[in-house]
Amino acid sequence: MSLELIVMRHAKSSWSDPCLSDHDRPLNGRGRASAKAIGTWMKEEGYQPDQTLCSTSTRTRETLDQLELDTEPNYLEPLYHASEDRMLQLLQNRAKGKSVLMLGHNPGAAFFAQAILSKPPKSDAFSLFPTAAVLVVRFDTTNWRDLRFGQGTLAAFIVPRMLLPQT
C-alpha cells in the first residue's frame, strides 16, 4: 500500500473589504468557480481523500466547502501561513488514512510542493503554485511519519486555468 497526498492552495480570495483581517477574507466569485471546478476534477479523477487537514482561515474553509468532498475536515490553526517544514511536521503527526488533502496558503504550500517531490512537473505554473493549484503526490510507504522531503512521486498537477474557459 502506498500513501497519496493532495496539496492544495486556497482559491482566489476577495480584497473588497479592507477592514477584514487576512484570516477572515472570503473567496471571490472567481475563487468559488475555480474551487468547484477543481472539486469536479478531483471526483472525475478518483481523488477522494480519507482525511482533510485544512487551515482555519475563511478562504481555505470556503475552498473546502466548494470542493464538495465526502470527507471530515480537520481545521488546524498551525496550517495558517505554515512553512514547508511545519506542513511536513503536521502531516507526519496528524495524517490518517491512505489519502490526505492538505489545504493551505502560499508561500508555504508552494515551497512544500517543490520540496516534497523527487522530480517536479514540467509546468510553468508549478513554481508559482497559483490559487486553487492542486498537486497529487504518491509515496512508497505505509506510514505518514516516515515521509521526508524529496520522496514523493508526481501523480498529477492542475490549476483552474486548465479546467475553466478563459475570459
Where are these regions (language model features)?
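Glycine-rich phosphate-binding loop signature in dinucleotide/nucleotide-binding domains
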Residues: E45-Y47, N93-K98
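Residue-level preference for the first positions of well-ordered beta-strands
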Residues: L5, S99-L101, V134
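A glycine-rich beta-strand to alpha-helix segment
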Residues: G97-I116
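Short amphipathic alpha-helix with an adjacent loop that forms part of the alpha/beta core around
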Residues: R86-R94
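Domain-level recognition of soluble alpha/beta enzyme cores
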Residues: P120-A155
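Active-site-proximal alpha-helix that buttresses catalytic centers in soluble enzyme cores
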Residues: S2-R86, P121, F129-P130, L164-T167
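Charged phosphate-binding loop/patch that engages nucleotide di/tri-phosphates or the phosphate backbone
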Residues: G150-T167
